[in-house]
Amino acid sequence: MKKIIILLLIVSLSLFSVGCKNTTASVNTNSKVSASTENNTSNESSNKVSSNSNTSNTIKTEPLQKDLKYNNEGIPVLMYHSVKYEKDNPVRIPVEKFKEQMKYLKDNGYTTLSLDELYDFLENNKPIPKKSVVLTFDDGYKDNYESAYPILKEYGFKATIFMITSCIGTGEYLTAAQLKELQQNGIDIESHTVNHEKLNTLSYEKKLETLKKSKETLEKLLNKEVKYIAYPYGNYDDSVVRATKASGYKLAVTTKGTWSDKSDGILTLDRVHISGFSDLANFKLRISTPDYNK
């Protein structure tokens, strides 16, 4: 009986020993799987981080506003008159030549500014695109409506016409209806006095009279404030400037042949004359070089 009991004890101990070894093996196997899973997860995370790092390295930052200019720089304010061919008359530019110039501006990324925008640029330092120009027309010829206006509309350009108010509806000048249509469609109408007087030759009282009367005539016709003027012949002196300011104008242009900048004075801004004799190369020079006359 004792032998039987001893034999049973030996068998039981043997079975217990085998069970422990299998359990240990199972735990070790699970540990390896777990470790392998952690390593794979870690590698995947590392790869993701690396991938993210590469992505962040390739993100392009927004460019600086290098394509803007401020009022420490100048701007070409272009001066036209009639858009119509006339032999040996530099004040009149042929339609084909005008369109060639406007197409060049459009194709080369130029922005046209209103006089409101020019004022904000010079007086309030509001930035504008580097390649900006201002288009102005003196006197108020009918061909500004018949020839220039369709081209300006085609390219989406802004412009300003300085109108001699006594000429409205006469001869080769713009009619009241044409002025209203132009004003409503991005072509600003401003003053060029009543009779195109040489302001520096008038008494102070006469200066005030023509400056105020032309302003009032246009304001009544167009139902808007008239704030800008072009001096006839470009003539002015200190008395003209004082009368212009006293009459309520905020900005005035002359015929001096350089770019406008804040050093000119807001009531004596320069302009760039575009002659009917100028070829495209000369036009390019004038809109790209502030001191093109030197």
Predicted segments — roles?
Residues 1-24:
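Sec-dependent N-terminal signal peptides of Gram-positive bacterial secreted proteins and lipoproteins
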Residues 18-44:
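Signal peptide processing junction and immediate N-terminal pro/mature segment
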Residues 32, 40, 47-136, 142-143, ...:
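C-terminal active-site subregion of NodB/CE4 polysaccharide deacetylases
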Residues 78-79, 188-196, 232:
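Histidine-centered catalytic micro-motifs
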Residues 141-142, 195:
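Short, glycine/acidic-enriched loop or turn micro-motifs at the edges of active sites
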Residues 149-157, 174-191, 246:
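Acidic (Asp/Glu)-rich catalytic clusters
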Residues 162, 192, 252-254:
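Short beta-strand and adjacent tight-turn residues that come in two discontinuous sequence segments
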Residues 168-172:
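Active-site glycine- and acidic-residue-rich loops that bind
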